[in-house]
Amino acid sequence: MTYAIIEASGKQLWIEEGRYYDLNHIPVEPGQSIILGKVLLLNKDGHVSLGHPCIEGAVIKATVMRHLRGKKITVFKMKPKKKMRLKKGHRQELTRLMIDSIMT
């Protein structure tokens, strides 16, 4: 089983080939390919490579499937005894990526 741990959108993700992942919005049109270069760990058929902090020459090829919005969260702020109440909603803009290949 081949997998990698990468850093993208301020998060560290465990990724595998052929699966899709939702990241923060990336300004790329759907259908286009992108390359993710910050590979922190790579496991290829039991052989583990660990970067300091990144593995040189290891890249992840991915295709942008679509842009979507995440689940709605509600933010509620209140100050006691002051009748101050603030209720807001937020939906994060996301980009869904399909991992095509993990290359060294």
UniProtKB/Swiss-Prot annotation:
GO terms for cellular component: chloroplast; mitochondrial large ribosomal subunit. One of its GO terms (molecular function) is rRNA binding. It comes from the Eukaryota. Keywords: Chloroplast, Plastid, Ribonucleoprotein, Ribosomal protein, RNA-binding, rRNA-binding. It is found in: Plastid, Chloroplast. Its main location: plastid. Pfam families: Ribosomal_L21p. GO terms for biological process: translation. The keyword Iron-sulfur does not apply. Part of the 50S ribosomal subunit. Belongs to the bacterial ribosomal protein bL21 family. HAMAP family: Ribosomal_bL21. NCBIfam families: L21 (TIGR00061). This protein binds to 23S rRNA. This is Large ribosomal subunit protein bL21c. The lineage of its organism: Eukaryota, Rhodophyta, Bangiophyceae, Bangiales, Bangiaceae.
